[in-house]
Amino acid sequence: MRYIVFIITFFFLLNSYSQDTVYARRVIKKLCSKELLGRGYVNDGVNKAATYISKELKTIGLAKFGKSYSQSYSFPVNTFANSMSVIVNGKTLTAGKHYLIDPRAKTVKAEFQLFKKDSLTYEANDGRRPAPLKVKLRKKLTYTVATELSDTTIVELLKDSFPNELKTMDVIFENKFVSNFKCQNLVSYVNGTQQPDSFIVFTAHYDHLGAMGKDAYFPGANDNASGVSVLLNLAKYYKKNPSKYSIAFIFFSGEEAGLLGSRYYSENPIFPLSKIKFLTNLDLLGTGDDGIMVVNATVFKEQFEKLKQINDSKNYVKKIKQRGKAANSDHYWFTQKGVPSFFIYTMGGIQAYHDIYDVEKTLPLTKYIEVCKLLIEFNAKL
């Protein structure tokens, strides 16, 4: 009888939990707002995002390991905070839409004659080697973050916008290299009811690419405001329904700069890594039309089978694909230190990625609730 009551209660809680997509939308919209400028390094966007997440954790009522949720660290990063201009063949281009500046670039204020090297590459040839400017035509513009500088400026142009041969390019922008940008991870938890010294850990990075000049910023709805919203929703669930194990929620910065926040944390853990029973890293959770991918599935086969069995029974997602070990997100450093871990992301749907089009308005959240339910049931079987 007690078992039946437990099952009924468990699924009632899951159904109640499933109603909170409104909260998910609110979180994603805030994280993608112009106020936070892509959660990067212009106007301290990433730390403004940390302040917002910390307030949410406090409102939910999550515990701290110390006086605050914050774990501070720093790293170098290149930024473009001021206005920029790129004119090609006399046509003024729009930042983010028509062009990207290499994130490693130094200040440039010059006009260049362009010479075609091949079908997708042009160079400015003023006698210097290497050439001071390279222009690359791309089918899609995909931005990133740089922690170092380059002597050659690369400008990427959207290929479909330039059917004719390039002749001239007028480029104006300023960089500011910050050698010691202060950033933070956020760490919180819900105490376990039976084995509080053992932890189930959820992680997600909250940083993104920030801004490129004054006219372009990268909202990062799918990458990874979606994952942050899942962690906050799971935090709300476990605060009301504690597990027998403690549940920790870690929000990393510096992921887009090279998994820097998670690396720092893995080398300076707030609680012993040996206490982690399992870690699930979540990123790109805004779609799911084609199911989910589980990185490390071939490493931790027993846990993967548990996850797969749940989905085979409940049909939460179309399919669960498996990959082996990969250094493609914040789970990596934990795997390297012997912590059993998965990295889960959704597949299919929108194609916006590391560009100005990854926005809250078009993020479908196709299998958002189903993935959350799958995670809750998976944790219950660990």
Task: Describe the function of each predicted region.
Residues 1-22:
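Bacterial Sec-dependent N-terminal signal peptides
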Residues 20-48, 60, 65, 69-70, ...:
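N-terminal capping segment at the start of a domain
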Residues 37-128:
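Noncatalytic luminal/extracellular "stalk/propeptide" segments of secretory-pathway proteins
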Residues 106-109, 137-219, 236, 244:
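Soluble metallo-hydrolase cores and metallopeptidase-like ectodomains found primarily
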Residues 236, 351-382:
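His/Asp/Glu-rich mid-to-C-terminal helical/loop segments that flank catalytic regions of hydrolases
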Residues 242-243, 252-352:
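Metal-dependent peptidase/peptidase-like ectodomains
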